[in-house]
Amino acid sequence: PGDHWQKLANLRALLTYQITRPGKSLLFMGTELAVPSEWNHEQSLDWHLVHDPTRAAFLLFVARLGDLYRRTPALWARDGEPEGFEWIDAADHASSVLSYLRRARDDHAVVALNLTPMPRGRYRIGVPEPGEYRCILSSDESRWGGGDYGASPRVTADDIPYHGRRYSLELELPPLSAVIYVPARSRSSAERA
């Protein structure tokens, strides 16, 4: 739903959700181009869309997601194990925000999705350890076609219990977006650059 910008923002959030959930992800016939029409086996993909700057930015976002997945073991190392995924909050109906952890053996990633067209400022989520976290993805960056609302590149966990965890992060969540944070000490070679 929404205008062209909102549709692409929703699709960026959806693909981030898809790739950060357990299991293998599949892009099908034009998803990487944000093709507005349903796939039709009787015609080719709408390759002309790569000349549209918003679709070109979306294609760069999809490439970034693939690279991020490859470089962040917490997103895939324990796909087949229950310990590889943990909800932080799956029930915030009032704010329409989902948050969860993905885990490798000695690392984790924090994923938060704001599924409304309203920014969520000072949004708190519980995390498993103290220290600094770095943002390795914000789907709202202008280079992907987003609005650059301003997800913080680095944030320090507060000693404030939240969501049943001893520490918490206070995040700025852009509208219709996904953000991924990892501990600054993380071995993930993915950088938000």
What are the roles of these predicted feature ranges?
Residues 2-27, 31-193:
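Carbohydrate-interacting/catalytic domains
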